[in-house]
């Protein structure tokens, strides 16, 4: 017995160093491992977490590792200057740290649109030395460079490489969604003419995109085409994790209704606005058999109207128009339960609610259109001149959000109380283009100021300045300036234009409202298609209409230019 106990004791003593080493190795793995292990893994925390780790680091190597992790995350948080500042602090690095730093530097260059620099940095990286996580980051930078160059196919090829390296389901889904977004927005000619050349995954993606493009105008057929694609490509990554925005197609039902409620202010202060929108709605309805029941929101509270709508068995609603009434719906979402609702305005409180979409002639649409137009025109340092009021703040915010998406930097926003204020913002501004929101008389003063400054800056304006009262002298003064407005104004010789011009006495503001009413009828008749079919759009009088975030109907504006005393359409 004693012999057995002694043998057990000796065995335990011999095993203790081994067990201790094994335990420590397990702890190292659990706590994140050494520097190389940390850098070779995903950085799932925010930058503040890693900066705190920097201050807790026991030695310089560990400190550098956490600075690299913080810099990596700062780039994804779009905090480029902070990331660069951290990298500049790094001095003596290990080989593993130098390798990881090179990926971060390439990522920063790609975000800053320095594509040649980013490309060169990637080419100097030895792929054999990268972990799966680092390889995924490498190809993510490659995809970003390709996107910067508008090369959707090369970006997709990089995304396919990323998919093979990811194991986390949520990250795989995000990568598939990004891949699909690239293809859906790609030029159709590029999609149709690209050959997969043995790349099975690319071939599947191209087939899915072609099926989508060919059937987009007929969502019922599109749903069938998607099902057929899944049958033909059962092992494709997108067959396992289908693009999120396409998943609703499997339950798609075409828009159908026999009754619709129209909610407008038809008395009181907003009577003219309500009646003009109704006239456009009625004209677009024309001889349709659909029954329209009209409710005056100035005479009856909106919550009462919605109860009446439900009691009448109506399941489709257009309106209300006034912001306070839209906000009331948002605060009492149960009112719209069981209904398809297209409001005729949006508010700052807007959010996604089941069967509800927002439509209106918002300044945000024009601001986003202006940012897109200026970017396409090669403008890289824009200034935005807007009035110091709610309209100006909304316009500036929308323009800047879109500009950040396009250029990864802020636009130069300037608010004014009087047109003369613009003088003080011109002196030291190295701007290549100016977007101006102003009434026509204010715009005339602003343009004169800019012209007199001797600057050769491209000028853009919102529809706010486009008025029927603008005389020939005004149009000559505006020579070269481009402005956005609804496409309805493209053909001023059409019978439809002349009819609406007569009805509204040539008031452009009322003509826009009439066009809005006509498009409200168009939109409600394509309600399910807009909500469920990504990329679905219809050509309306107020723009090319599609559903964006929160089912906010977005309008792609038409651009015009003053030329030799006249106005020409640029679209």
UniProtKB/Swiss-Prot annotation:
Record lipid sites (S-diacylglycerol cysteine) = 27
Q: How does it sit in the membrane?
A: Lipid-anchor
Q: Does the keyword Ribonucleoprotein apply?
A: no
Q: Where is the signal peptide?
A: 1-26
Q: Which Pfam families match?
A: LppC
Q: Where found in the cell?
A: Cell outer membrane
Gene3D superfamilies under this entry? 1.25.40.650, 3.40.50.2300, Tetratricopeptide repeat domain (1.25.40.10)
Gene Ontology cellular-component annotations: periplasmic side of cell outer membrane
Function summary: Regulator of peptidoglycan synthesis that is essential for the function of penicillin-binding protein 1A (PBP1a).
Please report which protein family the annotation says this sequence is part of: Belongs to the LpoA family.
The protein's name: Penicillin-binding protein activator LpoA
Organism equals Pasteurella multocida (strain Pm70)
Q: Which gene encodes it?
A: lpoA
